[in-house]
Amino acid sequence: MKLVKLSVVTMLIAGMASCSFAADTLADAFKNGKVSGELKVWYFDKDTEKLNSSTSPTSVLKDTAKSGDILNTTVVLNYVTDAFYGFKLGTTIQANAAPFVDEEGKEAYKDDMYGSGAVLSEAYLGYTLGKTNAKIGRQFISTPIVNGSGSRIVKESFEGATIVNTDLPATTLMAGYIDKFQGRTSTGMGETDGNAPTFEKRAIFLGVSASTTYKFDDAYTAAVINKSIPNLTLTGQYAWAGDVNSGINTKDVDIYYTEANYVLPLNGFKLGFDANYRGSKTDLISGTGVNVIGYDGTQTAGRISISELAGFGAAFTAATTSSDDAVIAGMGNGASSYTATLVKASSPSLRANTDSYRFDFTYDFSKVGVDGLKTILQYGLANQDRVKSATTSADYISYAAGVSYAVPALKGLSLELQYEKQEIETTRYSNNTKFTADLDELRFKANYKF
């Protein structure tokens, strides 16, 4: 933390030396600040089956701990001061309630939706000098491998420091320090069920788990984005997290990410070509015996897409992971893989010895006069071969659909409906038997931004 404290002093000195500022006084900076917010009403419902044993299954039964429904109502309020000598203060509070949830819903969604109360998710000091922007404190971060997800009612956040510079032509440089993480609920942060999350020195390491946070010491990251070549975007990022505790052992974790995105404009439509190579370097493990899982793995992925074809779009994505080890995609649930599905996301595709595929079909109804209405159909596969001497492996098949509507008559209001059915076929190698369990989840989201 000495580094962060020194950075604050440096920013203060630099700010006072600058003659460029928006507000004349500190009082004006607060008076001229901007307030924005969002009202959310979300309803989730899921029905889940499971095997009676994860290592020696003999039958499929209903997973009562992961079946139920929940209605959440949330208020998000954001306030950012006007600039004063280049400085700004920013805050965001998320207040959530689940007024009608029953015991079944509480249990089913305790990790990601059931957490009543409020959390100050952003509370930062920002400073801008030329083309350099810095933030210290609690803040939302969205980079390929440090990324707080907003797919649940409470958005994930980080506490630390970030700096972004765009002085180099067509290039963005970013560096960051992560001290703490805020998840989705108190349960997800390792605390008592049913409350709002807090900031703790534990985080989601996606690929190990999407719901359980693990203790860590500190984390650092650096990234570069370059757009020097027309229609081509190149991205690279590295992150290091110290003393990550999986419950089995405690090890440092290195995570790296590279990506190339190329868009080819043609007459009446666009073609997209995307490639991604990512990996994690660590001795961290989970599980025991022949079912131990290592995370010293890689994933290679590619995507071909067509868009803006009279409102239609389509994409085919494929990815493969290393044969012996799974991959840690990053910190936070926003660090998703290319073949993440609409509702159930990335976890199946990050396992060791897994080939995953996804097909997307989209349509924008504004092309036929219905502004704001969009749809998506999705089909996904994540097929896993046996890893070393593991007792089981599993194949996932996903069918998903979504419709979203930005209501033109009321600016700021949007509605979204998502559904996914996932079939999980588990092979038990001791007697070469197969068992299929289903998972169905429906999500409705109504949001009003002001």
Give the location of each predicted region:
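Flexible, surface-exposed loop regions and adjacent strand-edge segments
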Residues: 53-57, 106-109, 153-154, 190-196, ...
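Transmembrane beta-barrel outer-membrane domains
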Residues: 66-72, 113-122, 151-156, 213-217, ...
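Outer-membrane pore/translocation modules
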Residues: 98-114, 168, 175, 180, ...
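Signature for the C-terminal beta-barrel architecture of outer-membrane proteins
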Residues: 130-134, 152-322, 327, 379, ...
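C-terminal structural cap/anchor segments
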Residues: 312-404
